[in-house]
Curated annotation (Swiss-Prot):
Subcellular localization(s) per the UniProt record: Cytoplasm
Record's function text: Modulates transcription in response to changes in cellular NADH/NAD(+) redox state.
DNA-binding region: 25-64
Transmembrane region(s): none
Transport recorded as keyword: no
Similarity comment text for this entry: Belongs to the transcriptional regulatory Rex family.
Organism: Bacteroides fragilis (strain ATCC 25285 / DSM 2151 / CCUG 4856 / JCM 11019 / LMG 10263 / NCTC 9343 / Onslow / VPI 2553 / EN-2)
Annotated protein name in UniProt: Redox-sensing transcriptional repressor Rex
Length: 220
C-alpha cells in the first residue's frame, strides 16, 4: 500500500478538541520512531510511549482516515505526512505578535514555531526602546502602525502577549483590522465575534492545575 492511497483528507472542524490536542503528541512520537529507523508503528506502540490507551489512539487516528495493516500497524512516513497535513503544519501561516515583553520576546525567538506552520512576521509594541528594532530577524513596529502593516503583510492570525489590562482593547483593534484568529496567552478571557477563532493558552492556568495536583498528592 503506497502513501498516496493511504491518505484521505477529512474536515478537521468536525474533530473533537481533545483529539486535536492529542494528535500532535502522536506526531512527535512517530517522528522519534522514524529517527530510530522504524518503518511501521501500531497504536499499542504509541500507547506505551505516551501513556494513552491504545483504543483511544486508534479512535483519534480514525478522524484522519489513515488505514493501517493488520498485525503491522501504520506506515510511519504515511502517518507523519497525513498528520502534518491534517493539523495544518504543512502550510505556513503568517502571524503578528502584540506585546514584546518577556513572553512575547520568547515566542519571537522560538524558531521552532515554523516547524508547526506558524511564522511570526512582525511584532507590535509601544515601548520606544523596542519600536524600530528587530528580534530574531523579526521587525518590531509601533502599535499605531498595525493597520498599515495589515495591508502590507495580509496576515490573519494575531498572537496576544500584552498586559491583561489592555488585552480586550488590543483584541478589538486586531479584529477591526482584519485578524481572523487570536492565539491568546493572557489570563484574560477576551470577547470576540462568533466568526473569530480564539485559542486560549494561559500559562498561569496551567500552573494552577499543576500546583493543585501537587498539593493533592502531598496530602495523600
Amino acid at each position: 500500500m503506497t502513501m498516496n492511497n493511504q491518505i484521505q483528507h477529512k474536515d478537521s472542524t468536525k474533530v473533537p478538541e481533545p483529539t486535536l490536542r492529542r494528535l500532535p503528541w502522536y506526531l512527535s512520537n512517530v517522528k522519534l520512531l522514524k529517527q530510530k529507523g522504524e518503518r511501521y508503528v501500531s497504536s499499542t506502540q504509541i500507547s506505551k510511549e505516551i501513556n494513552i490507551d491504545a483504543s483511544q489512539i486508534a479512535k483519534d487516528l480514525s478522524y484522519v482516515n489513515i488505514s493501517g495493516r493488520t498485525r503491522v500497524g501504520y506506515e510511519v512516513d504515511a502517518l507523519i505526512a497525513v498528520l502534518e497535513d491534517f493539523l495544518g503544519f504543512t502550510n505556513m501561516h503568517k502571524a503578528f505578535l502584540f506585546g514584546v515583553g518577556s513572553l512575547g520576546g520568547a515566542l519571537l525567538r522560538d524558531s521552532g514555531l515554523s516547524h508547526f506552520g506558524l511564522e511570526i512576521v512582525a511584532a507590535f509594541d509601544v515601548n520606544p526602546s523596542l519600536v524600530g528594532t528587530t528580534l530574531n530577524g523579526i521587525p518590531i513596529f509601533h502599535s499605531d502602525d498595525f493597520q498599515k502593516k495589515m495591508q502590507e503583510y495580509g496576515v490573519h492570525i494575531g498572537v496576544l502577549t500584552v498586559p491583561i489590562e489592555i488585552a480586550q482593547c488590543i483584541t478589538d483593534t486586531m479584529v477591526a483590522g482584519g485578524i481572523k484568529a487570536v492565539w491568546n496567552f493572557t489570563p484574560f478571557r477576551i470577547r470576540v465575534p462568533e466568526d473569530i477563532v480564539v485559542q486560549n493558552t494561559s500559562l498561569y492556568a496551567h500552573l494552577a492545575v499543576m500546583f493543585n495536583r501537587l498539593n493533592f498528592n502531598e496530602i495523600e
